[in-house]
Amino acid sequence: PANYFHILRRQMMRDFRKPLVLMTPKSTLRHKANTSPLTDFVNGSTFHRVISNHLSDDEYKNVNRIIFCSGKIYFELQDHINELQLKNVYIIRLEQLYPFPYEALNEGIKKFNHCEMIWCQEEPQNMGAWEFIENRLKSVLHLVGAKNELHFIGRRAAASPATGVFDRHLANQKNIIRLATEANLDEIEKEKSGVSLVKYKLPIE
């Protein structure tokens, strides 16, 4: 909520006008973790283009996988990480896609250049942020000397943004979260064209 407040405030307080496009799904309004302390609204606080959690030195040493994401899928990923008590996975959220936050990302991932790098989205591969951010994010990873390539996890490219079958949607969503947080890179590489249910003998989306 604080970041949403600050982006609106920034838009109105600037001495010039340009379009602001916000994508805010309703489901996050009901999520218990979607809260901000009062201090995040005041005392010189501002809009954050990139958000990540603070880690202690011991916690940092355990991290070997970075998940980049944007939007509400963060809450599902974090819930799953908390449920399984995964100490090796760290999430970096892109709160602004354009202009792309090169500098903020650069600073945020320098010390993680040894980690596996994942971009996770629930949208099909030809939708969502992936096709826009792929080369931009790869350029940042190159600058910080990342040891591993960037892997995509999301739904298979499709003509429609939705499956039309709720059970199918949930099964794919569960698989996306599992791949991003638990699967090894070999399994992720096999799914690089996107998640679908064809292997479960269900219709392709």
Predicted region positions:
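Secondary-structure transition/capping motifs at alpha-helix termini
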Residues: 13-17, 61, 80-89, 111-115, ...
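Peripheral docking tails and interdomain loops at the edges
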Residues: 1-2, 10-14, 20, 25-28, ...
